[in-house]
């Protein structure tokens, strides 16, 4: 058992908080975001978001004040790198250069960090190379988020991209297969996170998500998308299995199959053995079944690789990145 953190993950449609000490998830809170608070993955008002976080914390009876935050992709740059072996000082000097194709000017306006994945040794046992996850984030964005958490009554202690959060969950986890993918069925998109030999490799984004299921239900029942979302969650009048909705499931399953095949084509010596499903869409059994029928791999829940939990799987399955953000912190 280590120090307890509150993991925070802000998505396009909801904010997720998870309290974890690295071994056990003790509390989860999920709140739907007001319309317009997050647009295209970017927080529109940090003050309004801070007030929402403060309200969520109050409604859950309080959480540890040290926050581990999943930085949105719009505010960070991520790369997996293979570099010659070098000292920590040399690596810190070299990291800005590795982002030169993404940051054309003002590299000093960014903060850089990394997580080591592994080292390669030569015949004599001396280090020859190293694999790592590298991230760059704007100093202004980090300052804005630091102030946001301060206003919410929390302290920003850890900031990391979602790729590092998933690496914390899967890397070195005896319950996770080394060659696997995490499928996040989120509101606007479906994202596949691929792992190679237990290390985060790459992500693929499918531009179909829960909102498309909502739209199909809205069309069938003649309601707006917000009502359709409630119909979906409660399976009102078997809305989860209507013909129109099954068509969306099949579209998602086909695109997932294509993404898996494309990854296999680029990595002919690797076989993805399992897909761990998460996100709100993973609670839709017909959707997961459609993916399992189409993909020639084992499909299971992300709960297979999550820490033990005092809260329900229906909650933890929706916030794996928030949980992952709290793990391996200072450990």
Task: List where the protein language model places each region.
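Gly/Thr-rich phosphate-binding beta-strand-loop-beta motif of the actin/hexokinase/Hsp70
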Residues: 1-34, 64-72, 171-202, 206-212, ...
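Glycine-rich phosphate-binding/hydrolytic loop that grips phosphoryl groups
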Residues: 165, 211, 282, 300-331
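Active-site neighborhood for divalent-cation/phosphate handling
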Residues: 71-172, 304-308
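Non-catalytic, solvent-exposed interaction/assembly segments
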Residues: 1-98, 102, 143, 151-153
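Glycine-rich phosphate-binding loops at beta-strand->alpha-helix junctions
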Residues: 270-300
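Adenine-nucleotide phosphate-binding core of ATP-dependent small-molecule kinases
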Residues: 219, 227-274, 281, 321
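Glycine-rich phosphate-binding loop plus the immediately following alpha-helix
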Residues: 38, 139-168, 199-238
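Short glycine-rich phosphate-binding loop at a beta-alpha junction
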Residues: 62-74, 149, 154-158, 267-280
């Amino acid at each position: 058992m280590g120090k307890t953190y509150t993991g925070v993950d802000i998505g396009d449609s909801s904010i997720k908080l998870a309290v974890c000490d690295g071994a056990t998830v003790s509390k989860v809170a999920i709140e739907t975001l007001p319309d317009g608070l997050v647009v295209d993955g970017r927080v529109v008002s940090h003050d309004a978001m801070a007030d929402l976080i403060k309200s969520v914390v109050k409604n859950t009876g309080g959480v540890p004040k040290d926050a581990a935050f999943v930085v949105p992709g719009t505010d960070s740059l991520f790369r997996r790198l293979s570099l010659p072996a070098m000292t920590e000082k040399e690596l810190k000097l070299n990291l800005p250069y590795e982002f030169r194709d993404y940051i054309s000017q003002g590299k000093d306006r960014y903060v850089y960090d990394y997580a080591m994945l592994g080292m390669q040794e030569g015949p004599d046992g001396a280090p020859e190379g190293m694999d790592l996850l590298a991230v760059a984030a704007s100093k202004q964005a980090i300052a804005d988020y630091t102030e946001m958490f301060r206003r919410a009554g929390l302290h920003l202690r850890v900031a990391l991209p979602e790729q590092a959060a998933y690496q914390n969950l899967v890397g070195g986890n005896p319950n996770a297969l080394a060659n696997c993918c995490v499928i996040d069925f989120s509101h606007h998109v479906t994202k596949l996170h691929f792992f190679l030999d237990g290390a985060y490799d790459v992500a693929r984004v499918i531009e179909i998500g829960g909102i498309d299921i909502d739209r199909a239900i809205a069309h069938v029942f003649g309601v707006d998308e917000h009502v359709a979302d409630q119909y979906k969650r409660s399976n009102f009048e078997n809305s989860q299995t209507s013909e129109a909705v099954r068509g969306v499931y099949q579209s998602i399953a086909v695109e997932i199959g294509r993404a898996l095949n494309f990854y296999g084509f680029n990595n002919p010596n690797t076989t993805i053995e399992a897909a761990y499903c998460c996100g709100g869409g993973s609670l839709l059994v017909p959707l997961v079944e459609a993916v399992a029928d189409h993909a020639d791999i084992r499909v299971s829940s992300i709960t297979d690789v999550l820490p033990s939990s005092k809260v329900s799987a229906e909650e933890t399955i929706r916030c794996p990145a928030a949980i992952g953000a709290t793990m391996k912190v200072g450990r």
